[in-house]
Amino acid sequence: MASTRLFVLLVIGTVLLCQVSGFLDELLAEHELPQDMTKRGCRNAYSSAICGKVITADDCMRKSSSRMGSFARKKCQRLCGIC
């Protein structure tokens, strides 16, 4: 009886592990930059400590009158995809 429970738990664990590893591959593929964004003119004026951590992609969508929105569009063009 105990060996049957252990076998069922191992099978369920294996199935879940396969699903998670497939899901991680999809997530990594989504976060790759498109080829047109890797050209020379498309870059962030500040390091990734600012463009990516302090300034996020949501800040690119803010109103142009907001400080974060205007800074993001001017200085973090690669992050916002404005190239």
Swiss-Prot record:
One annotated GO molecular function is: toxin activity
* Chain residues in the propeptide: 20-38
Q: Where in the cell is it found?
A: Secreted; Nematocyst
Instruction: Write out the coiled-coil annotation as residue ranges.
Output: none
UniProt signal peptide: 1-19
Q: List cystine links.
A: none
Q: Which GO terms describe its cellular component?
A: extracellular region; nematocyst
* This protein's UniProt keywords: Cleavage on pair of basic residues, Nematocyst, Secreted, Signal, Toxin
Q: Which family does it belong to?
A: Belongs to the sea anemone 8 toxin family.
Q: Please identify the protein, giving its name as recorded.
A: U-actitoxin-Avd8d
Native organism: Anemonia viridis
